Amino acid sequence: MATPHINAKDGAFAETVLMPGDPLRAKYIAETYLENAELVTDVRNMFGYTGFYKGQRVSVMGHGMGIPSCSIYTKELITEYGVKNIIRIGSCGAVRPDVKVRDVIIGMGACTDSKVNRMRFKDHDFAAIADFGLLRKAVTAAETLGIPVKVGNLFSADLFYSPDPQMFDVMEKFGILGVEMEAAGIYGVAAEYGANALAICTVSDHIKTGEQTSADERQNTFDDMMKIALDSVLLK
């Protein structure tokens, strides 16, 4: 049923939804990769589409920026539309010297400075991890496509403009592969409501070196990440 944030009809979404932060990236994926793609929701211009990829029904929808925004959309997709699998496909920043701009990262887990998972988990630490089945399929798809990936921890930050830049040194020490703003929240929502989740991110900028991609490139390219996510949906 429709919600305050999603105006799709019952059954409008496939069991698996790919979720970029940017709704225009969702539009790009639908127009570039999906056959018979249909716009199923557009509340607040947070576009969602359902179509077919190599014969497999799949949906793609934006989730906005930050854990509060993505938590709303993922929760409603799971509880109101019966979505089983959420695959975030987004951008992240790198802090380690061995992680380069445009590298693809698969988030095995996600640390965070947000308190939302503690609120969900009765003020205890919750290990926000990806579903192993989705993770394994993504790695297999990447290997089949010949696309190198890095698998490990992400850090989901509440603030884009950090007041504590020294924290990036701590992240580097602890082996964090990428800094973004949603994965830990999505993993928490999926765990709470019995769904599966995975985050695949492309490095859009390097926090230490200052190298970065353009806004247009972030919106309309990063195709390796998209191909991995889409091909992983085909695997059993």
Swiss-Prot record:
Its EC number is 2.4.2.1. It is an enzyme of class 2 (transferase). Keywords: Glycosyltransferase, Transferase. Gene3D superfamilies: Nucleoside phosphorylase domain (3.40.50.1580). It catalyses: a purine D-ribonucleoside + phosphate = a purine nucleobase + alpha-D-ribose 1-phosphate; a purine 2'-deoxy-D-ribonucleoside + phosphate = a purine nucleobase + 2-deoxy-alpha-D-ribose 1-phosphate. It holds the Pfam family PNP_UDP_1. One of its GO terms (molecular function) is purine-nucleoside phosphorylase activity. The active site is at residue 205. One of its GO terms (cellular component) is cytosol. The keyword Cytoplasm does not apply. GO terms for biological process: purine nucleoside catabolic process. A purine D-ribonucleoside binds at residues 5, 180-182, 204-205. CDD domains: PNP_EcPNPI-like (cd09006). The record marks 218 as: Important for catalytic activity. Phosphate binds at residues 21, 25, 44, 88-91. The keyword Transferase applies. Homohexamer; trimer of homodimers. Catalyzes the reversible phosphorolytic breakdown of the N-glycosidic bond in the beta-(deoxy)ribonucleoside molecules, with the formation of the corresponding free purine bases and pentose-1-phosphate. Belongs to the PNP/UDP phosphorylase family. HAMAP family: Pur_nucleosid_phosp. This is Purine nucleoside phosphorylase DeoD-type. It comes from Tolumonas auensis (strain DSM 9187 / NBRC 110442 / TA 4). The gene is deoD.
